[in-house]
């Protein structure tokens, strides 16, 4: 079960930082989908990593599971954004997490997309998977500012810069 005050170890933070760096490496290359990073760990050893594919598919969770040559049963997944729980261009990430018997999922922030928001927690907990959230919340929220703006306002997030020369 997850609470608002989940406790995280230094190793948890290190694994989530790696997931965030994976997400940052694909920033701007995932089409309309957010860039997500995923790290799968067992006994504090990294079994696999994944990130959102170019143009948004496959999702990071799917790629991390696909990239592994190990049995993932009993492992722990760190993912920057709440895993999806709906059918779209891809099946729900919650399905592949359950199928691979991952015992714990830690995600950085809740997805504000109405199709996902808060649903993952209930689905995974109903399968006795421990779920924790809000690890590195401040840093990850900052990274997803453009994505959240787009989902809230249905507009692109635009950054403009103006420069002027001193010798005019």
Predicted features and spans:
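Residues that line or immediately flank small-molecule/substrate-binding pockets and catalytic motifs
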Residues: 54, 81, 109
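Anionic group-transfer/hydrolysis microenvironments
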Residues: 37-39, 50, 82, 163, ...
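N-terminal beta-alpha supersecondary unit
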Residues: 38, 42, 46-67, 136
């Amino acid at each position: 079960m997850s609470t608002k005050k989940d406790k995280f170890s230094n190793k948890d933070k290190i694994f989530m930082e790696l997931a965030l760096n994976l997400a940052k490496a694909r920033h701007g290359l995932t089409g309309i989908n957010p860039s997500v990073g995923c790290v799968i760990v067992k006994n504090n050893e990294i079994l696999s990593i994944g990130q959102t594919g170019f143009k948004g598919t496959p999702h990071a969770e799917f790629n991390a599971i696909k990239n592994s040559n190990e049995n993932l049963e009993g492992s722990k997944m760190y993912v920057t954004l709440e895993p999806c729980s709906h059918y779209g261009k891809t099946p729900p990430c919650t399905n592949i997490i359950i199928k691979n018997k991952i015992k714990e999922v830690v995600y950085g922030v809740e997805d504000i997309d109405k199709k996902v928001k808060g649903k993952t927690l209930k689905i995974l907990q109903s399968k006795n998977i421990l779920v924790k959230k809000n690890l590195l919340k401040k840093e990850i929220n900052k990274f997803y500012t453009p994505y959240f703006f787009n989902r809230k306002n249905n507009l692109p997030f635009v950054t403009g810069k103006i420069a002027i020369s001193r010798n005019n």
